[in-house]
């Protein structure tokens, strides 16, 4: 989670773009165990970054994008994981003056196709 603090410090120092990596998201197996470990940490780290930037008056000037390069299968595979699924993906957007509390886009009922 230290890399989130470093990202904030880089923004304060005037960096125009900061990219960071958190965990390893290629969960082809043991999806539930890994998610129970990693997702709370990601939630705390992103929440702290948003709050930190807001408290410093920087949030409207910084766009935060939490995103992977493709989605995961809507169905669990035989090793309790999810495989690559380029048909649907998701991203979390914050800051940058964006309106909050919205969902953009939709999938079918099973999350298979947009």
Located regions from the model:
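Ligand-binding pockets and gating/stacking loops
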Residues: 1-114
């Amino acid at each position: 989670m230290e890399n989130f603090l470093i990202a904030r410090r880089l923004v304060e120092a005037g960096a125009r773009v900061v990219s960071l990596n958190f965990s390893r998201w290629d969960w082809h197996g043991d999806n539930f165990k890994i998610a129970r470990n990693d997702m709370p940490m990601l939630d705390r780290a992103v929440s702290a970054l948003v709050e930190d930037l807001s408290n410093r008056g920087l949030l409207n000037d910084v766009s935060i994008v939490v995103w992977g390069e493709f989605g995961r299968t809507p169905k669990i595979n035989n090793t309790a994981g999810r495989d690559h699924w380029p048909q649907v993906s998701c991203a979390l957007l914050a800051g940058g003056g964006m309106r909050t509390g919205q969902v953009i886009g939709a999938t079918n009922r099973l999350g298979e196709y947009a």
